[in-house]
Curated annotation (Swiss-Prot):
This is Chaperone protein DnaK. Residues 602-620 have a biased composition (Low complexity). Disruption phenotype: Non-essential; synthetic lethality is seen in a triple tig-dnaK-dnaJ disruption, although this depends on temperature (triple disruptions grow slowly at 20 and 34 degrees Celsius but not at all at 43 degrees) and strain background. In pull-down experiments interacts with CedA. It is a peripheral membrane protein.
Amino acid sequence: MGKIIGIDLGTTNSCVAIMDGTTPRVLENAEGDRTTPSIIAYTQDGETLVGQPAKRQAVTNPQNTLFAIKRLIGRRFQDEEVQRDVSIMPFKIIAADNGDAWVEVKGQKMAPPQISAEVLKKMKKTAEDYLGEPVTEAVITVPAYFNDAQRQATKDAGRIAGLEVKRIINEPTAAALAYGLDKGTGNRTIAVYDLGGGTFDISIIEIDEVDGEKTFEVLATNGDTHLGGEDFDSRLINYLVEEFKKDQGIDLRNDPLAMQRLKEAAEKAKIELSSAQQTDVNLPYITADATGPKHMNIKVTRAKLESLVEDLVNRSIEPLKVALQDAGLSVSDIDDVILVGGQTRMPMVQKKVAEFFGKEPRKDVNPDEAVAIGAAVQGGVLTGDVKDVLLLDVTPLSLGIETMGGVMTTLIAKNTTIPTKHSQVFSTAEDNQSAVTIHVLQGERKRAADNKSLGQFNLDGINPAPRGMPQIEVTFDIDADGILHVSAKDKNSGKEQKITIKASSGLNEDEIQKMVRDAEANAEADRKFEELVQTRNQGDHLLHSTRKQVEEAGDKLPADDKTAIESALTALETALKGEDKAAIEAKMQELAQVSQKLMEIAQQQHAQQQTAGADASANNAKDDDVVDAEFEEVKDKK
């Protein structure tokens, strides 16, 4: 069995890890970094860039550089959170035919799973380069508070990237695995506070150890899937835009290039203010008007940043209270607090969390790498490489169906340990009703319309009977990935209908297959591009070395040969500017054929040089003998 890699598919950065024996190892990407920016760019010449190369060119290509795509995955275009992003993102977010939030790049409509798959492909390639073998299986992490549609969309992204997703696990749970694996024995209850680039989670986890086996049991989880570092950046960007407008009378929001530069500067300033008390946002030539170029130079203090984001930090505290309440615990029951996600490096976040729990968070867990390490550990558990570890996760939101009067009737309550299965018997609302519609919902509100609709299906063929007589058994079955399977059965006729809940929109099988094929075609195109570059390099080398040999041959090369070679060199030079590998190879072949006389001359010159060199060495050796004899050491007799 091959390795199952662990991938933290983050909003801002992603990370990949593997199990090296019984030790998890975070892998460095081709650029030598342990984390990869979750940024994808589509260049003018049709190339797809992922990670640092995409980030570097963002300033000059803002409309075609996609970031924070995880905030759109599994979401509807009309969602309030998506509408907030539509107004601030430099790229175009559109409504797909099925109502999902998609992105349009260079006239092409793309689904978020398709874009996230590019990041997963980079993670896959990083692992393959390290292991020296193909990788086909992965454990991918998601925010604990992701709903069913978002989990499905993440699995779809894995498939499009050519990965079989063996398990979807929650990010805080993965961080707890990374933390608990190498800590000493004994039972403890931990709180994992995970504030990443785009999402926030809190999980209360109990680690029990019995006879050397560790059980990680999630007691409760809560969060906000649209709260993270990107929101902190936005607050600072808005402040800088307003200050510049006051000072210069120009609104930078109308200038995508300026906004992209500002985004990078704001992110950098935010990071600097975690260790410094103040910083300068200095952007020369940020824009221009009729009077000439304009420069931005604004001082930002840590106190100013904190005042801008205080409500965001406070927003993360409410879920902590709910999670503790759901777990039936008080603050004093928590033994350790673990911070995960880059945004937790902000001193204000650390201070608020410490105040809430009454203890300092642990500093020995790497907030950027813990989640990927935990995913790799879970991969090791699935392959059998990691023993004595049992993971008991929960479903983050209640699941149920719509019943008479537009009420949601819960079948599986939030924070139920998964996998789990629950059945309940319902009946008809009308006399002689021959079909029922099962409308599946996820959420905590009593009114069905206020919850997330996961889909619906019909159960037909119910025998005519007075209302309330037929017995319809509805079964909810949640698998270990937290994905829901629903069945409805008429106990009288034995008729049954089953579905795996796909997002009421989501990608259908044909769309996923097409995206998988496109990804494979891209891989083929990438391979051909690599071969073309290698051939070009060989052609360049041949061009350079032939010109040098023509120069060295001088008058020894007959004029006819020289003319033929010059003509072949020009033809090769032209071919090298094109995109046709076969044409370059053909011109290299032609050059080699007309250069035979040149090769002979070069070989003769080389042989003469070697002979001359050998003669010179022999003469030197004779001279050396004379010198040595002259300076022969004579020891005095004592």
